[in-house]
Amino acid sequence: MRTITIVGAGEAGTQTALALQELGYGVTLVSDRSAGQIRSGSITSSQCVFSGALDVQREVHVDPAQRAAVGIGSLQLNVSGTPSPIAWTAPLDRPALSIDQRVKCAQWIEEFVARGGDFRIEKVTVRMLEDFAAHSDLVLVCTGKGELGQIFARDRRRSSFDRPQRVTAVTYVRRPEIGGTADDGDANLAGEGPQGTLRFSLVPGVGEFFTFPGLTVSGPCQMMVFEGVPGGPMDVWDTVQSSEEHLEASKRLLKEHFPHEAEAFADAELTDEGAVLRGRLTPTVREAVGILPNGAAVLGLADAVVLNDPLTGQGSNNATLAAHYAAESIRRRGDQPFDEAWMRETFDEFWRGWAQWSTGWTTSLLRPLRGFQLDLLAAAQEHPVLASSIANGFDDPRTVFPWWQDEDEARGMLEWAAHQERNGFDVRDFRSALGQFATGVTVVTTRSADGSRVGMTANSFTSVSMDPPLVLWCPSKRAPSLGDFEASTHFAINILASDQHVLSRQFATPAEDKFAGVRCAEGVSGVPLIEGAVATFQCRTVARHDAGDHVVYIGQVEEYTNRGGEPLVFHGGSYHATVRHPEFAR
């Protein structure tokens, strides 16, 4: 049995431990606190876990107290301090949840131990890491606290800041009429707004406030997060000493800068003495491989190497996805050594598929909003499909690129939003209805005129004819690489295997090099063939048909491979694996 030591029992450490334990590895989880100490201690974050990360948690049967938690089904945005105030509400495609890390991390540790896991309580030093590395096949560091944070060098290329961009304060409260038991989960915690809403208020140059329902150690609560520009009028926390002073400062900031929220929290009370947190952090990306004094290498995960400001609520999502990417990479490694090259490849895969987008999204909001970005927020008041796209960017940040960062792309997005609403349908509901049709997932590839490899994720693929052998797929007219497919004579359909969901995400991003880290062979006319796909079809383009906002490509199959295996399935906005129907399982 291969052995893995995980240092740090936060969201990333505990989820990785549970995932690897289920895969049959010998796992040691090391924390500086027991489950009981975590549960009775102070809050550690302002976590809000969106649906994509929740899907990952459920894969390892991590489902703590979710029945008692209030789902977050929409995002409400308010922008003041601008010539024209902005206010709108948009639904999330799927609900988010916020469960106090004191609740879930303590429960996950207990679950890990109940399954037979080796849990140790120690304050880990670099010297101890050397000992762990000598007696384990792999060491994962999931905390950047103390001297452990110094073993991972700052990545200057990927780090945008060298100092804190916000002064952060977090407050968990309950109101007297809400009470503190899980049975009160249907109570309206959101003042004038609808229950189950993440309310995000922004004053350019001053700071932000956001609040959402959650579940803490005493039951349902409302979580309050203040993000003040350093040196500005919301930078008031240095003189605060006690929990009560913290609560009073929270209410005072609402009256002064977010008066539309003040009344809802006038009678708010702390959920417990540990329900406050304040501080400053410098958003930083670090090298994922740490080299210890004795030459041993360890792999950093989550906040240890990608530390984002809480402004966009990405921390818990980053931790969950980092755990997922790491566990998948470890599983695929089999009996091969966990060497430095593999460690870098594992992190780069996570960075390409997820972390670069969550980091870029957070960085864009930490910086002063540009004129076209304010225009997008304002236009969302008139275009619900645009508001929905912005709101769901908190769930999957790659979906807001490139139009959130590029002025020309932003204009195109505005035109698209206006056009989408002319058909009279609720675009979100129509897309959800179409999503009820389960499909496989493909990556369609070709070569550009200059010989570069081109690819995009698509599930709009189907067979057309057996004689001659024809297939079709339908790219969007807004796809950046559409011109490359128009100029090429051939393309390849690569049907992804169940364990290739990482590639599905990677090829669905606007990244410059989507093929980074992807093993490919070369097919007809040089089209890339992705290794590990359950089937590939090398096609000559025989027809293109205009079809609304998409183009229908018909290709004649010239060569194909049928490797077989379990395909990746997409349904209802998330990935699935094939399962034999129980009535036909016998």
Could you describe each region identified by the protein language model?
Residues 6, 279-358:
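Conserved mid-domain beta->alpha element of the FAD-binding
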Residues 7-9, 21-42:
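Glycine-rich FAD pyrophosphate-binding loop
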Residues 33-79:
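N-terminal FAD cofactor-binding segment of flavoenzymes
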Residues 63-155:
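Conserved N-terminal helical subregion
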Residues 153-199:
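Central beta-strand plus flanking loop segment that forms part of the substrate or channel wall
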Residues 198-276:
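Conserved FAD/dinucleotide-binding core of flavoprotein oxidoreductases
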Residues 312-313, 328-422:
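C-terminal helical "tail/cap" subdomain of flavin- and related membrane-associated enzymes
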Residues 419-586:
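Basic, polyanion-binding surface patches
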